[in-house]
Every structure is written in structure tokens, then in C-alpha cells.
Amino acid sequence: MKIFGRLDLILLLAGATAAGFLINSLHAATQDEQANEHAVEQAVLAPITAMFDAMAKRDAAAIKKPLLPGGGMVLMRDGKPIQMTFDAFADLVGKPGKAKTEERIHDPLVRIDNDLAVVWAPFEFLVDGKVDHCGTDLFNLVRADGKWLIASVADTGRKDCSGK
């Protein structure tokens, strides 16, 4: 019993080949989109990394560079908000000192809409290589003249960083 004729078989193979090309094209497009999305997320994270690097160097001028002038911070400490301008923060953190400090974020959640971005990430703040406090950082960023700047920062800071 003949299920497929030659023409049916040729059409079936042609359809399968076309479907394969379509799937490969869609896969390549998806990979390109993912690569572009990753590049955009890295561009959003770059000013945060620059600020952390400048904080570790205690360089007030460099701390201010990736910050939107006039912006500010809200640091939650013991259930109370501490507000300060970016200038006050940079002057405080940019003071010379003997202790080696470093802030690290991990698993950042990045959301972008045109020229506005939000980054939510757990963090650890280390002093001389040991965790001093931890919590969650929240960064609001804006893109001005093609450059991402931190517009505001909020964080929770707590000492109970068990397992860190």
C-alpha cells in the first residue's frame, strides 16, 4: 500500500526543510535579541559599578561622576530612613581612611523602559574583607545624552547577614 506519492513526499520534505530554516532563523533572531538585551543591561549596570569602584578608592569626585546632579539617597537603618544628597554621600564616603571597603551586588534584577531603568539587587558591604552589613540596593537610573546616570538610590542595611 502506497501512503505517499512522489509529489507528496517532495512537498513533505520541502515543507520540513522550510520549517527547519524558519526555526533556525527564529533561534538566531532570539540569540541576537538576548545578546542586545544583555548589552543594554550591562550599560545600565556600568554606572553602579563605577560608583562602587570609586567608593573603594575613596574618591569623592569619581563617586559623583556616574550620579545625576541633585540626586539623593535613602538608607534604611534600624527601621529609620536616613536621607542625604549625592554630594553629601560622596563627601562622606570619599574621605581618606585606613579600612578597605567594598560593596558588591549580586543577581541584579534590571528593568528598562526607554530612558528609565531600575536595578534591584541584594548587596554586601565589606570592611577589610569581612561583611559589615548587607541588604538590598535599589537604583533608579536615567539616560541623558546617551549616558546612564544614577538618579536615586535606596537601600536596606542590616547587620544580621547570616551565612555571608
Language-model features: locations:
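A mature extracytoplasmic/lumenal domain signature
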Residues: 67-69, 77-79, 121-125, 137, ...
